Amino acid sequence: MRFYKALLPFKAISFDLDDTLYNNGPVIEQAELAMQQKLLQLAPKLGLIDPEFWWQKRKELAQLDPEVRHDVSRWRLLSVEQGLTELGMGRCEAGEIAELAFSAFYTARSNLTVPDSSHQLLKALAERYPLVAITNGNADLTLLRISQYFM
């Protein structure tokens, strides 16, 4: 690695949580499955909806409102609500069901075990530096049991 400027001592360290401290892919897959199961429970008449349908709703919403991509929770919630209305559900009911489905997603999304190696690293770094978590996602540091390391 080449440094073109003198490297000064660190004053703090920031982490993007997803795929840095743990493998996020399987976590999101499980969370999406939990959301699908909740939708099936709450709206059985709709049946099991292809995950590609929800991805298309997200892409459509991002085209209409590119800024929504910066709030992934809102983006997912609004895309589910939009998808449900397109499938024939009334707006009010779609909003309520989307909220409950997103809640299932969020709970499952935060239901993971951060590897011991990440805990050890964070503990050692937190003893020397202020640590900051940066994410555009919706991981809950308390539910992940890593909030004690961050400011």
Show where each model-derived region lies:
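Residue-level signal for well-ordered alpha-helical scaffold segments within enzymatic catalytic domains
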Residues: Q30, A34-Q37, Q82, E86, ...
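A metal-dependent, Asp-based hydrolase signature
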Residues: Q56-S103
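Short helix-capping segments at alpha-helix termini
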Residues: L40-L46, E86-E93, Q148-Y149
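Hydrophobic (often cysteine-bearing) scaffold residues that line and stabilize catalytic clefts
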Residues: N24, I28, V72, R76, ...
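Substrate-recognition element of Asp-dependent hydrolases with the DxDx(T/V) motif
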Residues: I13, I97-N111, S118-F150
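Hydrophobic alpha-helical core bundles mediating ligand binding, dimerization, or RNAP-core interactions
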Residues: A31-L39, W54-R58, R76, V80, ...
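Short, flexible, glycine-rich and Lys/Arg-enriched loop motifs at helix boundaries
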Residues: L46, A62-P66, D140-S147
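Active-site neighborhood of HAD-like aspartate-dependent phosphohydrolases
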Residues: R2-Q56
